[in-house]
Amino acid sequence: KDTDRSLFPDYYLQNFHHQTDGYLSDHSAGLYDLQVEILFNGTADAMRRRVLAPLKRGLKHFSDRSPSSLRVLDIATGTGRTLHQIRGALPHAELIGADLSEAYLRQANRWLNNGQSPLVQLIRANGETLPFADGGLQGATCVFLLHELPAEARQNVINEAWRVLEPGGVFVLADSVQLADSPQFHVAMDNFRRVFHEPYYRDYIADDIDARLIQAGFEAVTAETHFMTRVWSARKPAQPST
Protein backbone atom coordinates (compact mmCIF):
# COMPACT_ATOMS: atom_id res chain seq x y z
CA LYS A 1 0.00 0.00 0.00
CA ASP A 2 1.05 3.62 -0.52
CA THR A 3 2.63 5.41 2.40
CA ASP A 4 0.78 8.45 3.72
CA ARG A 5 3.54 11.01 3.31
CA SER A 6 1.66 13.59 5.41
CA LEU A 7 2.70 11.60 8.50
CA PHE A 8 6.36 12.55 8.10
CA PRO A 9 8.36 15.75 8.65
CA ASP A 10 9.49 17.40 5.43
CA TYR A 11 13.16 16.56 5.91
CA TYR A 12 12.30 12.86 6.10
CA LEU A 13 10.74 12.85 2.64
CA GLN A 14 13.92 13.77 0.78
CA ASN A 15 15.99 11.27 -1.11
CA PHE A 16 18.67 9.75 1.12
CA HIS A 17 21.56 7.58 -0.02
CA HIS A 18 20.48 8.03 -3.67
CA GLN A 19 17.27 6.08 -2.98
CA THR A 20 14.19 7.82 -4.38
CA ASP A 21 12.04 6.18 -1.72
CA GLY A 22 14.35 7.28 1.10
CA TYR A 23 13.40 5.33 4.21
CA LEU A 24 9.85 4.55 3.13
CA SER A 25 10.04 1.19 1.34
CA ASP A 26 10.67 -2.44 2.17
CA HIS A 27 13.23 -2.43 -0.65
CA SER A 28 15.21 0.30 1.13
CA ALA A 29 14.91 -1.50 4.48
CA GLY A 30 16.16 -4.74 2.94
CA LEU A 31 19.24 -3.04 1.50
CA TYR A 32 20.15 -0.83 4.42
CA ASP A 33 22.30 -3.15 6.55
CA LEU A 34 24.30 -4.35 3.56
CA GLN A 35 24.86 -0.77 2.41
CA VAL A 36 26.13 0.31 5.81
CA GLU A 37 28.46 -2.66 6.18
CA ILE A 38 29.94 -1.98 2.73
CA LEU A 39 30.33 1.70 3.57
CA PHE A 40 32.18 0.95 6.82
CA ASN A 41 34.20 -1.97 5.45
CA GLY A 42 32.43 -4.47 7.67
CA THR A 43 32.87 -2.49 10.91
CA ALA A 44 29.33 -1.09 11.33
CA ASP A 45 28.24 -3.58 13.98
CA ALA A 46 31.54 -3.13 15.81
CA MET A 47 30.95 0.62 15.94
CA ARG A 48 27.36 0.17 17.11
CA ARG A 49 28.64 -2.00 19.95
CA ARG A 50 30.50 1.01 21.34
CA VAL A 51 27.23 2.20 22.91
CA LEU A 52 27.00 -0.90 25.12
CA ALA A 53 29.71 -0.12 27.69
CA PRO A 54 28.56 3.45 28.47
CA LEU A 55 24.94 2.27 28.53
CA LYS A 56 25.70 -0.45 31.07
CA ARG A 57 27.82 1.94 33.13
CA GLY A 58 25.04 4.50 33.20
CA LEU A 59 22.43 1.96 34.22
CA LYS A 60 24.47 1.13 37.33
CA HIS A 61 22.73 4.16 38.83
CA PHE A 62 19.72 1.83 39.14
CA SER A 63 21.67 -1.16 40.47
CA ASP A 64 19.32 -1.47 43.44
CA ARG A 65 16.50 -2.45 41.09
CA SER A 66 15.64 -5.69 39.39
CA PRO A 67 17.21 -5.88 35.90
CA SER A 68 13.76 -6.72 34.51
CA SER A 69 12.42 -3.37 35.75
CA LEU A 70 14.78 -1.35 33.57
CA ARG A 71 13.38 0.18 30.38
CA VAL A 72 15.71 1.14 27.53
CA LEU A 73 14.65 2.93 24.34
CA ASP A 74 16.54 2.90 21.04
CA ILE A 75 15.55 6.05 19.13
CA ALA A 76 15.49 5.64 15.34
CA THR A 77 16.07 1.93 15.73
CA GLY A 78 15.93 1.29 11.98
CA THR A 79 16.36 -2.39 11.24
CA GLY A 80 17.08 -3.19 14.88
CA ARG A 81 20.79 -3.98 14.71
CA THR A 82 21.63 -1.90 17.78
CA LEU A 83 18.68 -3.29 19.74
CA HIS A 84 19.87 -6.80 18.95
CA GLN A 85 23.21 -5.97 20.55
CA ILE A 86 21.58 -4.28 23.54
CA ARG A 87 19.46 -7.36 24.12
CA GLY A 88 22.62 -9.45 24.31
CA ALA A 89 24.10 -7.05 26.87
CA LEU A 90 20.87 -6.53 28.86
CA PRO A 91 18.93 -9.76 28.42
CA HIS A 92 16.42 -9.02 31.19
CA ALA A 93 15.64 -5.35 30.48
CA GLU A 94 12.49 -4.17 28.74
CA LEU A 95 13.67 -2.96 25.34
CA ILE A 96 11.78 -0.61 23.03
CA GLY A 97 12.63 0.47 19.51
CA ALA A 98 11.09 3.56 17.91
CA ASP A 99 11.34 4.54 14.27
CA LEU A 100 9.35 6.61 11.77
CA SER A 101 9.54 4.03 9.00
CA GLU A 102 7.01 1.21 9.01
CA ALA A 103 9.15 -0.61 6.45
CA TYR A 104 12.23 -0.50 8.66
CA LEU A 105 10.19 -1.59 11.68
CA ARG A 106 8.96 -4.59 9.70
CA GLN A 107 12.58 -5.46 8.94
CA ALA A 108 13.47 -5.01 12.61
CA ASN A 109 10.60 -7.27 13.65
CA ARG A 110 11.86 -10.03 11.34
CA TRP A 111 15.35 -9.63 12.76
CA LEU A 112 14.46 -9.33 16.45
CA ASN A 113 11.19 -11.10 17.15
CA ASN A 114 11.96 -14.52 15.71
CA GLY A 115 10.71 -16.55 18.64
CA GLN A 116 14.19 -17.33 19.95
CA SER A 117 14.51 -14.46 22.43
CA PRO A 118 12.27 -12.20 24.54
CA LEU A 119 10.16 -9.90 22.40
CA VAL A 120 11.25 -6.34 21.76
CA GLN A 121 8.52 -3.70 21.56
CA LEU A 122 8.67 -1.81 18.27
CA ILE A 123 6.64 1.35 17.76
CA ARG A 124 6.30 3.88 14.96
CA ALA A 125 7.28 7.24 16.42
CA ASN A 126 9.15 10.43 15.61
CA GLY A 127 12.20 10.96 17.81
CA GLU A 128 11.22 14.64 18.05
CA THR A 129 7.88 13.79 19.72
CA LEU A 130 8.22 10.48 21.52
CA PRO A 131 4.98 8.88 22.80
CA PHE A 132 6.28 8.27 26.31
CA ALA A 133 5.52 9.90 29.63
CA ASP A 134 8.09 12.09 31.30
CA GLY A 135 10.74 10.21 33.25
CA GLY A 136 9.61 6.67 32.51
CA LEU A 137 12.81 5.22 31.03
CA GLN A 138 16.17 4.49 32.58
CA GLY A 139 18.25 4.37 29.40
CA ALA A 140 18.12 5.62 25.82
CA THR A 141 20.34 5.16 22.80
CA CYS A 142 20.45 6.84 19.40
CA VAL A 143 22.79 5.48 16.75
CA PHE A 144 23.59 7.01 13.33
CA LEU A 145 20.58 9.36 13.40
CA LEU A 146 21.84 12.87 14.10
CA HIS A 147 23.72 13.30 10.82
CA GLU A 148 20.46 12.58 8.97
CA LEU A 149 18.68 15.52 10.64
CA PRO A 150 18.61 19.30 10.23
CA ALA A 151 19.96 21.18 13.23
CA GLU A 152 16.63 22.00 14.87
CA ALA A 153 15.48 18.39 14.67
CA ARG A 154 18.79 17.27 16.20
CA GLN A 155 18.14 19.40 19.25
CA ASN A 156 14.53 18.24 19.45
CA VAL A 157 15.58 14.58 19.57
CA ILE A 158 18.10 15.26 22.33
CA ASN A 159 15.50 17.27 24.27
CA GLU A 160 13.03 14.39 23.99
CA ALA A 161 15.60 11.89 25.24
CA TRP A 162 16.09 14.08 28.31
CA ARG A 163 12.34 14.34 28.86
CA VAL A 164 11.56 10.62 28.76
CA LEU A 165 14.48 9.60 30.98
CA GLU A 166 14.09 9.21 34.70
CA PRO A 167 16.42 11.44 36.74
CA GLY A 168 19.73 9.59 36.83
CA GLY A 169 19.03 7.97 33.46
CA VAL A 170 21.69 7.58 30.79
CA PHE A 171 21.62 8.69 27.14
CA VAL A 172 24.19 7.28 24.69
CA LEU A 173 24.65 8.65 21.17
CA ALA A 174 26.78 7.24 18.38
CA ASP A 175 27.28 8.91 15.04
CA SER A 176 29.89 10.01 12.54
CA VAL A 177 33.10 11.64 13.65
CA GLN A 178 33.17 15.42 13.26
CA LEU A 179 35.62 18.04 12.10
CA ALA A 180 36.53 19.15 15.63
CA ASP A 181 37.55 15.71 16.86
CA SER A 182 38.84 14.17 13.61
CA PRO A 183 40.14 16.94 11.32
CA GLN A 184 42.39 14.40 9.60
CA PHE A 185 39.25 12.93 8.01
CA HIS A 186 38.08 16.23 6.51
CA VAL A 187 38.45 15.02 2.91
CA ALA A 188 36.80 11.69 3.68
CA MET A 189 33.88 13.47 5.33
CA ASP A 190 33.39 15.75 2.36
CA ASN A 191 33.52 12.81 -0.03
CA PHE A 192 31.06 10.86 2.13
CA ARG A 193 28.53 13.68 1.94
CA ARG A 194 28.72 13.91 -1.83
CA VAL A 195 29.13 10.27 -2.78
CA PHE A 196 26.46 8.87 -0.48
CA HIS A 197 24.01 11.78 -0.73
CA GLU A 198 23.74 12.92 2.87
CA PRO A 199 21.85 16.25 2.74
CA TYR A 200 22.48 17.31 6.36
CA TYR A 201 25.93 15.86 6.89
CA ARG A 202 27.89 19.05 6.20
CA ASP A 203 25.97 20.87 8.94
CA TYR A 204 26.28 17.92 11.32
CA ILE A 205 30.07 17.59 11.15
CA ALA A 206 30.45 21.22 12.26
CA ASP A 207 27.80 20.96 15.00
CA ASP A 208 28.56 20.98 18.74
CA ILE A 209 26.78 17.92 20.12
CA ASP A 210 28.27 18.38 23.60
CA ALA A 211 26.66 21.82 23.76
CA ARG A 212 23.34 20.43 22.54
CA LEU A 213 23.35 17.79 25.27
CA ILE A 214 24.09 20.42 27.93
CA GLN A 215 21.43 22.73 26.48
CA ALA A 216 18.87 19.93 26.89
CA GLY A 217 19.79 19.59 30.57
CA PHE A 218 22.20 16.66 30.55
CA GLU A 219 25.32 16.51 32.71
CA ALA A 220 28.46 14.36 32.89
CA VAL A 221 28.81 14.58 29.11
CA THR A 222 31.69 12.50 27.77
CA ALA A 223 32.73 11.64 24.23
CA GLU A 224 35.12 9.17 22.63
CA THR A 225 36.17 8.47 19.06
CA HIS A 226 36.34 4.93 17.72
CA PHE A 227 37.49 4.67 14.09
CA MET A 228 34.86 6.69 12.15
CA THR A 229 32.36 6.88 15.01
CA ARG A 230 31.95 9.39 17.82
CA VAL A 231 30.18 8.13 20.96
CA TRP A 232 28.65 10.47 23.54
CA SER A 233 27.34 9.53 26.97
CA ALA A 234 25.32 11.86 29.19
CA ARG A 235 23.25 11.64 32.34
CA LYS A 236 20.00 13.29 33.31
CA PRO A 237 20.68 14.86 36.71
CA ALA A 238 19.50 12.70 39.58
CA GLN A 239 17.00 14.13 42.01
CA PRO A 240 18.68 15.22 45.24
CA SER A 241 18.10 12.90 48.16
CA THR A 242 15.74 14.16 50.82
Say what each PLM segment does.
Residues 155, 172-216, 220-226:
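C-terminal alpha-helical "lid/dimerization" subdomain adjacent to the S-adenosyl-L-methionine
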Residues 128-140:
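A short acidic, Gly/Pro-enriched loop at the edge of an enzyme's catalytic core
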Residues 216-242:
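Core SAM-dependent methyltransferase catalytic element
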Residues 155-167:
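A short glycine-rich, Lys/Arg-flanked "PGG" loop and its adjoining helix->strand segment in the class I
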Residues 1-57:
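Conserved Class I S-adenosyl-L-methionine-dependent methyltransferase catalytic core
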Residues 73-74, 79-129:
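Class I SAM-dependent methyltransferase SAM/SAH-binding core
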Residues 71-73, 138:
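Conserved beta-strand elements of the Class I
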Residues 138-152:
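A short SAM/SAH-binding and catalytic strip from SAM-dependent methyltransferases
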